[in-house]
From Swiss-Prot:
The keyword Cytoplasm applies. One of its GO terms (cellular component) is pollen tube. InterPro entries: ARM-type_fold, Mon2/Sec7/BIG1-like_HUS, Sec7_C_sf, Sec7_dom, Sec7_dom_sf. Keywords: Cytoplasm, Guanine-nucleotide releasing factor, Membrane, Protein transport, Transport. Residues 486-676 form the SEC7 domain. The gene is GNL2. It comes from the Eukaryota. This is ARF guanine-nucleotide exchange factor GNL2. The active site is at E590. It is found in: Cytoplasm, Cytosol; Membrane.
Length: 1375
């Protein structure tokens, strides 16, 4: 404790010594004469008796203080020094020393805010410093004193007790400092610089305390005046001094200087130096105050009104330096106070930044404005907030869209080298694009972390308006999701309103109908809706608005009243309000219309006036009419004698309820109209920010929703980018084209990828446009260059290779969002192949054709989020960095790399193969577009082939890619292949379509797809049907196809029949396979393979045949056995297999019969069971139909030239009838029908053939061969007849049938063989008749009956056929 006490005592002694030193210094300077004649002894005594005595008294107390210095009233040791400063008899040098003494006292902080008397002491210091008096001296000494004053002022504000200063004292300090700045003008740069620095420091100190000022609970109303009373006066300075100082700083923006122009007259212009100084101080105040300004209404209103008005007024016409400072100030306001500055910020962009950037006169100013725009774009939330608050509000300008288009417009290169402003604009555009892309990716990342099925998934459909929602009413942000939908609808309304304005300007009726059709106005019509349309929609014809509002119809009058209610005239003068009203339309020429419109205005203006100057609205009405007439009088060149002010006042006497209006008021109105005419333009156009419009804007702030602070939403991001997508792509493409700098090219590609990152969320047309734009830089699609020129450009210029890498990178990364762009990609791919820059290794795909990926595997892949996000960005751009690093030609040459190897390295980085091998993750629509492009390219659309070989190779290449896609997407074959099939049909109708290479190269691939589908054994049979449908149209396109491709077709068809017949389930599949097998079996080279395949099918895989496919199998088998040069052994095998196939018919018949029997059960007595019964009956009939088809095949085969085959066909026919006798359930009529249509024609055809040979010369061998076959056929007839006899005898048609049998016996018996001798059938027929009639007698079918003439007919026919048999067959019987 003793050591602490000693240390404190030493500190107190040090303070005493310091004070003693300062007193001595001041006294020494006072006593020192400046010159021998300067001071007389009397004057020295006078100084000693007043100021010196005070200093001496202080010295007497210094070393004997009664208490600690921190507890002593500071005025005790400050007042002597202040007396020196305030004395006008003290030399300037002594004043300077006294100021230094006070500064030292403040710096070592002898007292603090808790010291008794500290507040009075601080205020006395301020009072003493600001009332400092100097005797006349030289300028250098005065400057030295002023420098000391500035230091002391700063010391005062930095002292801990400064918070005890009164508001007036703080304002005095600032004012004193500014006076020093002003007085230093022209006296020296050093003093002025120090003065400005001090002022800046004071502002920083004062406004840094603003966030700590307490806000009273009753503060916050728009008209609250609590700003000036919220801090207790005993607590030191507060918001009141901040308001006064800020007001003072704003007023500095209006400081003018008088300059002489070229004409020799003096004009007043803004003092730029003072403006810059003021802007620096205002910037500091806003930066340090932050959002605390928003807690103090009066200060906030000053920023909203005074400051913003000044900044906008001077911004558009200032120098680059001033504009730069203004932009910085506005950016700070945006950062801290944008919630309160919605309309003000819009006005700044509209009247300053966008206007200056559009003006092409002064490039430095334009560059500063552009930099201001870019600085805003650098703010993380600016672009989305600008879009939400302005672009989505029908009453505001499209700030975001216009900003983006301004950057695009300035990015576009000209014919010369790139300028600084173009580079700057490009950087801004890239920032904007990256901002949108990063935010959309960031939201996706956050959404995936929270929930894989988050609610913000992008829907590709645009916003549609389905109901009437008042477009002029904004909705506060409560629920974010609902609010996002609301602003998207408002943006859609805004677009529709622009279209409606266009319609309205051309035809009023069509414009109003368009409004109703798009739910922009209600039905029945709401007058406010139409009034808001007239009031807030830009681009409307003002003449048409005036004509509509002036119409006397009741609806038009209602709209007029609503129209006037959209104006806020509170606080406006009459002339200002009338100007604002008349600027929104053009007054019609009819006086009655003008009358109605002025009446509506007068009523609205009168209702919103707080003053008592007008007795009634009639007064306003009369005065408005008078002002309009005055405007015409003063500004119409045809009026020679102008009305004077006195005449105007005299004309308006006694209009205020019989009394006169104040003469001063009328005089002000007259001067306003005389000097500034009403703006009565016809069309909407650019306007200036004048005081009238500013008042209107401030009135609108009372009813407008505050600036919405919102987070990024991917739906909003997609919509906002769509507004600038076209210009952005064009600008980036043009910049890429005109730039040769590697870094700039890299930035262009980076921007292109970011555009694609945004476009993948439902903006597919934009991505297609991007790809088409960059494909032209590859030089691969230039139709006017030769392959050699293209190859040279590709090999020696980095830009084409970089563009190629970019295009295929987009295809790999964003292929799921590409639509029409696939055509350009395919064209580039084909050109690379034509240039031999595409080695086979690049496009070798590993696709398992036999098994492929399962559907569950594909679902796992597709369930993953395939969207590109920023986590992929580093690797993607890393590829381009690697590309740029390897693109050094000299380095490549040093490494021994040829041009081909360099190009190959680029192509390998393109990963072209993955586009197709990984197409399973592409969405359906992307697969459709990619396939369409490839099919059309394979058909030759857009291609020019120099040789047939080139055409064949190109077609094969395209088909390889098509098949790769199909093989990779078998799991969703039903989705995309129907469209592919339509594309195949379409290309067949192309004018220059060449079917041979197209089908020849396509068929093998289609068979590969077919085999994979069959190998997959899918539950759904539609893929099988689809692929066979395409195969069918392919080989039917041209009759030469089979001749060209028979070997390939045979190979694949045989494989399908042998290995995958169990998986063939469709009718068209079996039909196609067996038809192709039949056609290919006609060729000697493939005949044996085709026949073996059929025999294998019928021998080992016949169980896989269905009733439908059985018919095609029989047709195919018949086609083989009917061939003349086919193997007899194999044909006989086929005939045996055909006969044995009756067992399959029996099986199907029994199944159908069983089902039919079950359908008759009592429980099935419903309509559904009846339908089932009908189906089963159709099944039975179909089996009988198949039996007939089989028999018909045998019948046709009986006419074959080779005897072995004919005879086997006849016996097979008998075998089939015999096997189906009992098990196929033929009815009597059915049996007769089969024999009548198969066996009878067989005998007839053989008999006719026999007679034909008998008439030919040297044809005895053939005739005898045919005769032998006919014998067998006759025996078959007898055997079949006897087998089916008991069934057919029950038929009513048996008599006719029996006559048919006898007729054929007679025909064969009497066949005349001519010169070749006897007919050996005469030996067979009697035997056959004997057997048949004998059997019929045994079964008592052929007996004499009174009511049956069968016996009689037979008896008579036998006498004609073989009379010798009559006695044998009918020994005891006679007619």
């Amino acid at each position: 404790m003793d050591r602490i006490a000693v240390r404190a005592k030493r500190k107190e002694l040090g303070i005493s010594c310091m004070l003693n030193t300062e007193v001595g210094a001041v006294l020494a300077v006072i006593r020192r004469p400046l010159s021998e004649s300067y001071l007389s002894p009397q004057e020295t005594d006078h100084c000693d008796s007043s100021v010196q005595q005070s200093l001496k008294s202080l010295r007497a107390l210094i070393f004997n203080p009664q208490q600690d210095w921190r507890t002593i009233d500071p005025s005790v040791y400050l007042s002597p020094f202040l007396e020196v400063i305030q004395s006008d008899e003290i030399p300037a040098s002594a004043t300077a020393v006294a100021l230094s003494s006070i500064l030292k006292i403040l710096k070592i902080e002898i007292f603090d805010e808790k010291t008794p008397g500290a507040k009075d002491a601080m205020n006395s210091i301020v009072s003493g410093i600001t009332s400092c008096r100097l005797e006349k001296t030289d300028l250098v000494s005065e400057d030295a004193v002023m420098m000391r004053i500035l230091q002391v002022l700063t010391g005062i504000m930095k002292h801990p007790s400064s918070e005890l200063l009164e508001d007036q004292a703080v304002c005095t300090i600032v004012n004193t400092c500014f006076q020093v700045v002003q007085q230093s003008t022209g006296r020296g740069d050093l003093l002025q610089r120090n003065g400005r620095y001090t002022m800046h420091e004071l502002i920083q100190i004062i406004f840094s305390r603003l966030p700590d000022f307490e806000v009273r609970g009753d503060e916050g109303g728009e008209d609250s005046e609590s700003d000036t009373d919220e801090i207790d006066m005993s607590g030191g300075y507060g918001i009141r001094c901040c308001i006064d100082i800020f007001h003072f700083l704003c007023s500095l923006l209006n400081v003018v200087e008088v300059v002489e122009n070229l004409e020799g007259t003096n004009v007043h212009t803004a003092d730029e130096d003072v403006q810059i100084f003021a802007l620096v101080l205002i910037n500091s105040a806003i930066e340090l105050s932050g959002d605390a300004i928003g807690q103090h209404p009066k200060l906030l209103r000053m920023v909203q009104d005074d400051l913003f008005h000044h900044l906008i007024h001077y911004g558009a016409s200032s120098s680059p330096l001033v504009l730069s400072m203004i932009c910085s100030c506005i950016l700070n306001i945006y950062h801290f106070l944008r919630k309160f500055m919605r309309l003000q910020l819009e006005a700044f962009f509209s009247f300053v930044l966008l206007r200056v950037t559009a003006f092409t006169g002064f490039l430095p100013l334009q560059e500063v404005a552009l930099e201001g725009l870019i600085n805003f774009c650098r703010q993380p939330a600016f672009i989305v907030e600008a879009y939400v608050n302005y672009d989505c509000d029908p009453m505001c300008r499209n700030i975001f869209e216009e900003t983006g288009k301004v950057l695009c417009r300035h990015t576009f290169p000209t014919s010369g080298p790139l300028t600084s402003i173009q580079i700057q604009a490009f950087e801004g555009l890239v920032i904007l694009i990256h901002n949108i892309a990063d935010n959309m990716d960031r939201e996706e990342d956050e959404g995936n972390e929270e929930d894989d099925n988050n609610s913000n998934v992008i829907k590709p459909s645009p916003v549609e308006i389905h109901e009437y929602i008042p477009f002029w009413i904004d909705k506060p942000k409560e629920d974010f999701e609902t609010w996002v939908d609301h602003i998207r609808v408002r943006k859609a309304q805004k677009r529709k309103l622009a279209i409606a304005a266009n319609h309205f300007n051309r035809d009023e009726k069509k414009g109003l109908e368009y409004l109703k059709y798009n739910y922009l106005v209600s039905d029945p019509l709401d007058p406010m809706a139409l009034a808001s349309f007239f009031r807030f929609t830009p681009g409307l014809d003002k003449t048409m608005i005036g004509d509509y509002l002036g119409d006397p119809d009741e609806l038009h009058l209602s709209v007029l009243r609503s129209f006037t209610h959209t104006f806020e005239f509170t606080g406006m003068n009459l002339d200002t309000a009338l100007r604002t009203f008349l600027e929104s339309f053009r007054l019609p020429g009819e006086s009655q219309k003008i009358e109605r419109m002025i009446e509506a205005f007068s009523e609205r203006f009168y209702d919103q006036q707080s003053s008592d100057i007008f007795a009634s609205k009639d007064t306003v009405h009369i005065l408005c009419y008078s002002l309009i007439m005055l405007n015409t009088d003063q500004h119409n060149p045809q009026v020679r004698r102008k009305m004077t002010e006195d005449e105007f006042i005299r004309n308006n006497r006694a209009i205020n309820a019989g009394n006169d209006l104040p003469k001063e008021y009328l005089s002000e109105l007259f001067q306003s109209i005389a000097t500034n005419a009403f703006a009565l333009s016809t069309h909407s156009g650019p306007v200036e920010m004048n005081p009238n419009r500013w008042i209107e804007l401030m009135n609108r702030t009372k009813t407008t929703q505050p600036f919405s602070l919102c987070q990024f939403d991917r739906r909003i991001g997609r919509d906002m980018f769509a507004t600038i997508a076209g210009p952005s792509i064009a600008a980036v493409s043009a910049f890429f084209e005109h730039s040769d700098d590697d870094e700039v090219l890299h930035e262009c590609v980076d921007a292109m990828i970011s555009i694609a990152r945004v476009a993948q969320y439902g903006l597919e047309d934009i991505l297609d446009e991007l790809i088409a734009s960059f494909c032209k830089f590859t030089t691969l699609l230039n139709p006017y260059t030769t392959p050699e020129e293209t190859l040279f450009a590709f090999s020696h210029d980095m830009k084409p290779r970089m563009a190629t890498l970019a295009v295929f990178t987009l295809a790999n990364t964003f292929g799921d969002s590409i639509r029409g762009g696939w055509r350009n990609i395919v064209d580039c791919l084909l050109k690379l192949r034509k240039l031999q820059l595409l080695p086979q290794s690049v496009i070798e795909f590993e696709i398992n054709e036999e098994n492929g990926g399962s559907e569950s595997d594909m679902n796992n892949v597709s369930s993953q989020d395939t969207k590109f996000n920023r986590r992929q960005g580093s690797s993607l751009m890393g590829r381009f960095s690697h590309f740029l690093a390897l693109d050094n030609v000299e380095e490549s040459v040093a490494l021994g790399m040829s041009e081909f190897e360099q190009n190959l390295k680029v192509i390998k980085q393109c990963r072209i193969g993955q586009i197709f091998s990984k197409s399973s993750v592409l969405p359906d629509v992307a697969v459709l577009n990619l396939g369409r492009s490839l099919i059309y390219a394979a058909a030759g659309k857009g291609q020019k082939f120099s040789t047939a070989i080139e055409e064949e190779e190109t077609v094969k290449f395209c088909w390889d890619l098509i098949i790769t896609i199909a093989l990779s997407n078998v799991h969703r074959f039903n989705m995309f292949w129907p469209s592919y099939h339509e594309y195949l049909l379409n290309v067949a109708n192309f004018p220059l379509f060449s079917p041979i290479p197209f089908v020849e190269k396509g068929l093998p691939g289609l068979f590969r797809v077919c085999i994979k589908i069959l190998a997959s054994n899918l539950q759904d049979h539609l893929p099988e049907e689809l692929i066979f449908r395409s195969l069918t149209i392919m080989w039917k396109i041209d009759k030469e196809i089979i001749e060209t491709c028979y070997d390939t077709i045979t190979e694949f068809v045989s494989k399908i029949i042998i290995d995958y017949s169990a998986n063939l389930h469709t009718n068209i599949g079996w039909k196609s396979v067996l038809q192709l097998l039949s056609l290919c079996g006609r060729h000697p080279e493939t005949k044996e393979q085709a026949v073996d395949a059929l025999i294998g099918l019928m021998s080992f895989n016949a169980s896989h045949l269905s009733q439908s496919s059985y018919a095609y199998c029989i047709d195919c088998a018949f086609s083989f056995v009917a061939l003349r040069n086919s193997s007899v052994e194999k044909n006989l095998k086929i005939l045996d297999l055909m006969a044995d196939s009756v067992t399959m018919l029996v099986k199907w018949y029994k199944t159908a019969s069983t089902d039919t029997a079950n359908s008759y059960s009592p429980a099935s007595n419903t309509s559904s069971s009846s339908s089932m019964e009908e189906n089963n009956l159709r099944g039975v009939n179909f089996v009988h139909h198949l039996f007939l088809k089989l028999s018909e095949a045998f019948r046709k085969t009986t006419l074959a030239r080779r005897e072995e085959i004919r005879n086997r066909a006849v016996t097979s026919l008998e075998k089939s009838f015999t096997m189906g006798h009992e098990d196929l359930g033929f009815t009597p009529s059915g049996c007769i029908y089969c024999i009548d249509h198969v066996i009878f024609p067989t005998i007839d055809d053989l008999h006719e053939k026999l007679l034909d040979y008998s008439r030919r010369e040297n044809a005895e061998r053939e005739m005898r061969s045919m005769e032998g076959t006919l014998k067998i056929a006759m025996k078959v007839l007898m055997n079949v007849f006897l087998v089916y006899l008991e069934q057919i005898v029950e038929s009513a048609e048996f008599r006719t049938f029996w006559l048919g049998v006898l007729r054929r016996m007679d025909t064969c018996m009497k066949a005349d063989l001519g010169e070749y001798g006897d007919n050996k059938l005469q030996e067979v027929v009697p035997e056959l008749l004997t057997t048949m009639i004998g059997t019929m007698k045994e079964k008592e079918i052929l007996v004499q009956k009174e009511d049956d003439d069968l016996w009689e007919i037979t008896y008579i026919q036998i006498q004609w056929i073989a009379p010798a048999l009559k006695d044998e067959l009918f020994p005891d019987e006679e007619i």
